[in-house]
């Protein structure tokens, strides 16, 4: 379904508003650098502080600018099931290939609640769903048995998972419970290599925002079983993976983008604030280590 280096795009702001022109340039740069799909309005895109109108415009611009060159997996997550469906229906009409749907956060639903939430979305929208499991942010974990139940019940609707649990055993668990062809994407850049070795097909990546060509080359080496080359690229990228989270995300990502894209500002929305001096130092050192500045 999906594979390769898939950036979870940052949303550029200028003077408090969505900077559409810079976002279009970011989309072009990503595609020209080898990114295989794009994810607007995810965690890194500050979806939680976008209005619905802004959220939909970011998705719309991404799809317009991609112009069919790569698929767009639109961020459709919400802790309000009805609002998630609103995002999905808009994204379907706009031309998205799938919707990335995070486990509802703050509400802390049970596994039965998660099944009801994702079942409602699957039954009321034609947009394929990529499950997004990130318990460090949502508290609630989409357990393996829940994933298997959902995919078995809706095989044509729930088509992939982005797993950011950090538990590599889940790749094998999903392969055993669902099948080897089920699309599994890493949500942890630092685990991209072992996740792929276990059976994953790529990553929805934060680091790919600022190092799209390196990340695309890294995944190509993995796919070609060029382990020595993959390790070499992993070594170059590894400090950057951690630097992207050296302060509250996506502040370090936006600072890094401002260093590699002249027109990209490091502006974030409250309650996130700009990256600290220590974080900026870590980002600069990681960018230099990767050969990006």
From Swiss-Prot:
The lineage of its organism: Bacteria, Pseudomonadati, Pseudomonadota, Alphaproteobacteria, Sphingomonadales. It is found in: Cytoplasm. InterPro entries: Aldolase_TIM, DapA, DapA-like, Schiff_base-form_aldolases_CS. Its EC number is 4.3.3.7. GO terms for cellular component: cytosol. It catalyses: L-aspartate 4-semialdehyde + pyruvate = (2S,4S)-4-hydroxy-2,3,4,5-tetrahydrodipicolinate + H2O + H(+). One of its GO terms (molecular function) is 4-hydroxy-tetrahydrodipicolinate synthase activity. Catalyzes the condensation of (S)-aspartate-beta-semialdehyde [(S)-ASA] and pyruvate to 4-hydroxy-tetrahydrodipicolinate (HTPA). Keywords: Amino-acid biosynthesis, Cytoplasm, Diaminopimelate biosynthesis, Lyase, Lysine biosynthesis, Schiff base. The keyword Protease does not apply. This is 4-hydroxy-tetrahydrodipicolinate synthase. It comes from the Bacteria. The record marks 43, 106 as: Part of a proton relay during catalysis.
């Amino acid at each position: 379904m999906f594979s390769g280096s898939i950036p979870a795009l940052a949303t550029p702001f200028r003077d408090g508003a969505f900077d559409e022109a810079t976002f279009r340039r970011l989309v072009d740069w990503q595609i020209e650098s080898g990114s295989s799909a794009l994810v607007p309005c995810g965690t890194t895109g500050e979806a939680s502080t976008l209005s619905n109108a802004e959220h939909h415009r970011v998705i719309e611009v991404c799809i317009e600018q991609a112009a069919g060159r790569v698929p767009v997996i639109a961020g459709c997550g919400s802790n309000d099931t009805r609002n998630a469906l609103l995002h999905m229906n808009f994204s379907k009409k706009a031309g998205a290939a799938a919707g990335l749907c995070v486990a509802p956060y703050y509400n802390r639903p049970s596994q039965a609640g998660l099944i009801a939430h994702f079942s409602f979305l699957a039954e009321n929208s034609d947009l394929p769903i990529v499950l997004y499991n990130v318990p460090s942010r949502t508290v609630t974990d989409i357990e393996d048995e829940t994933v298997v139940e959902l995919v078995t019940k809706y095989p044509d609707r729930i088509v992939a998972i982005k797993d950011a649990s950090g538990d590599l055993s889940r790749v094998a668990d999903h392969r055993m419970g669902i099948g080897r062809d089920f699309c599994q994407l890493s949500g942890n850049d630092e685990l991209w290599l072992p996740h792929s070795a276990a059976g994953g097909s790529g990553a929805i990546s934060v680091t790919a925002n600022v190092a799209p060509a390196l990340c695309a080359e890294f995944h190509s080496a993995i796919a070609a079983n060029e382990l020595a080359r993959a390790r070499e690229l992993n070594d170059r990228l590894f400090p950057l993976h951690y630097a992207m989270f050296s302060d509250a995300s996506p502040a370090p990502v936006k600072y890094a983008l401002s260093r590699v894209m002249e027109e990209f500002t490091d502006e974030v929305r409250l309650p996130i604030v700009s990256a600290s001096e220590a974080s900026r130092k870590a980002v600069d050192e990681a960018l230099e280590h990767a050969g990006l500045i």
